[in-house]
Amino acid sequence: MFIGMKSSSQLRQEALEYTYNANTPLKIYLKVCVSILDKAQLEFQKGDIFSAYVLYYRYADLIANKLSDHSELALVAERDQTVLHREEYYQLVKLELPAVLKIVEDLQKNIDLDYNKIQLSLSKNIAKQQKKPNHVSEPVLLPKTFNENRFNQSISFFNNMNSNITLENKMHGNNNNNTHQELLYPELPTLSNASYI
């Protein structure tokens, strides 16, 4: 039974989702209580504190809230079996229930601490994602002296020169990196409003 990351209040709601029938004999519910407690301890030993919390809480609710009103507890002892089951119930209330309530309390603290850490981490991640600005490129204003045709010719010349150098190196088998080839860069526009001029 994997519960996942939920708050203790969500887990409590889940723990209370079970069917109780007041007409079911007390001895059956006592066996159910022992079974729930065994499963809770097994889940706790496996490290699944969420499932363990649900089962321990369900056990405590069944013992303290549901079975306390069971009709066999109110009957005057007519049979030895009824007396035996009643005594077993009162032993559970006296001996096991306080220990289980302490376990529930400790597990609740751990679950709430983990849940709050995860919620804080998630909220920080969401805040980081919202803070990232959308990079919208603004149009670049070119200086009035910029000549687009001349710039494109320079780029074309540069590309042709580089392809010619690469072709010559391949033809002559000259792959030596020590050979110095002069590279020509395109002429860039002069900025008239530059602050460093």
UniProtKB/Swiss-Prot annotation:
Protein name (record): Regulator of free ubiquitin chains 1
Matching PANTHER family: AMSH-LIKE PROTEASE (PTHR12947), PTHR12947:SF20
GO molecular function, one term: cysteine-type endopeptidase inhibitor activity
Organism: Vanderwaltozyma polyspora (strain ATCC 22028 / DSM 70294 / BCRC 21397 / CBS 2163 / NBRC 10782 / NRRL Y-8283 / UCD 57-17) (Kluyveromyces polysporus)
UniProt family annotation: Belongs to the RFU1 family.
Membrane spanning residue stretches: none
The protein's role, per its UniProt record: Inhibitor of the DOA4 deubiquitinase involved in the regulation of protein degradation by the proteasome and maintenance of a normal level of free ubiquitin.
Keywords per UniProt: Endosome, Protease inhibitor, Thiol protease inhibitor
Subcellular location(s) per record: Endosome
InterPro entries with a match to the protein in the record: USP8_dimer
Highest rank taxon of the organism: Eukaryota
Keyword Mitochondrion: no
Cellular component, GO, one term: endosome
Predominant localisation class: other
Gene Ontology terms describing biological process: ubiquitin recycling
